[in-house]
Amino acid sequence: MNVGDRVRVTSSVVVYHHPEHKKTAFDLQGMEGEVAAVLTEWQGRPISANLPVLVKFEQRFKAHFRPDEVTLIED
């Protein structure tokens, strides 16, 4: 997975910070977005992030995922 790849959320991930559903449970399963970052290092040092894939969706919304929670969309 690289920055700029289109991905789809394949597993049930519930968030509470979606802009249209503030403070209520919202399931991201089936949503599509773009990989904004893959977190492997911080300040030049390697890290082992629990949720390393940062995905940007529409409407100024981003969320972190495990690699097995998203799949690439082939164009």
From Swiss-Prot:
What would be an example GO MF term here?
oxidoreductase activity
A Pfam family found in this protein is: FeThRed_A
Q: Which InterPro entries match?
A: Elect_transpt_acc-like_dom_sf, Fd_thioredoxin_Rdtase_alpha, FTRV
List the disulfide bonds in this chain.
none
Q: Where does the source fall among the domains of life?
A: Bacteria
Q: Name one GO biological process term.
A: photosynthesis
Q: Which keywords accompany this UniProt record?
A: Oxidoreductase
For the region Interaction with ferredoxin, what residue ranges are annotated? 43-46
Q: What does this protein do?
A: Variable subunit of the ferredoxin-thioredoxin reductase (FTR), which catalyzes the two-electron reduction of thioredoxins by the electrons provided by reduced ferredoxin.
The record's family statement is: Belongs to the ferredoxin thioredoxin reductase alpha subunit family.
Q: How does it assemble?
A: Heterodimer of subunit A (variable subunit) and subunit B (catalytic subunit). Heterodimeric FTR forms a complex with ferredoxin and thioredoxin.
Name assigned to this protein: Ferredoxin-thioredoxin reductase, variable chain
